[in-house]
Regions:
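Extracellular jelly-roll beta-sandwich "head" domains, especially the C-terminal globular C1q domain
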Residues: 1-166
Length: 166
């Protein structure tokens, strides 16, 4: 017997080059994590294109996740790979995925992470989300970083797996 739901999907990995040479300045004001998609590890050949109509999941021009080719009910797994460069002890960092109009849906990737020492810290977070409305689907989603003390951030890349329902 067959189940009522069928799933298909694919993935892409967008690697950044620009922030390696010019890290993102992080302050108390939420700042978008940028990714030019020009890194040697960028790989979009496994996007679920054939018959599924998904052409991209990351928009390098707007620096945001583009879910417009997905349907309400589709699912995504996102892996964020960054390094934060902490210049002052006891720096607290947050990274949130803001989705929907005005960032009305907030998915925390890093919440109140206190870096007690200075230095460079690699941070990898993996989060599963779903497209719960047309607003979430049709509005560019962004990862935004902020900190209570000035620091910098290098984006290594974003891996995104799309799972289509139906």
């Amino acid at each position: 017997s067959s189940s009522g739901d069928a799933f298909s999907g694919g993935w892409a990995d967008y690697a950044d080059v620009a922030t390696t040479g010019s890290p993102i300045a992080v302050t108390a004001v939420p700042t978008a994590l940028t990714n030019d998609g020009l890194g040697v590890d960028t790989n979009t050949k496994y996007l679920p294109i054939s018959g599924n109509g998904i052409t991209q999941l990351w928009n390098t021009s707007s620096n945001g996740f583009d879910f417009s080719d997905l349907n309400v009910g589709d699912m995504l797994d996102i892996r964020m790979d960054i390094s934060v460069i902490i210049a002052s002890t006891n720096t607290v960092v947050d990274v949130n995925l803001l989705m929907g109009t005005g960032g009305s849906v907030v998915v925390p990737f890093i919440s109140d992470q206190n870096y007690k020492a200075t230095g460079t810290f690699e941070v990898i977070r993996y989060m599963g989300i779903y497209i719960g409305s047309t607003d979430v689907r049709d509005t560019l989603a962004q990862l935004k970083i902020e900190a209570d003390k000035n620091c910098t951030c290098i984006v290594h890349g974003f891996y995104i797996k799309a799972i289509r329902r139906g």
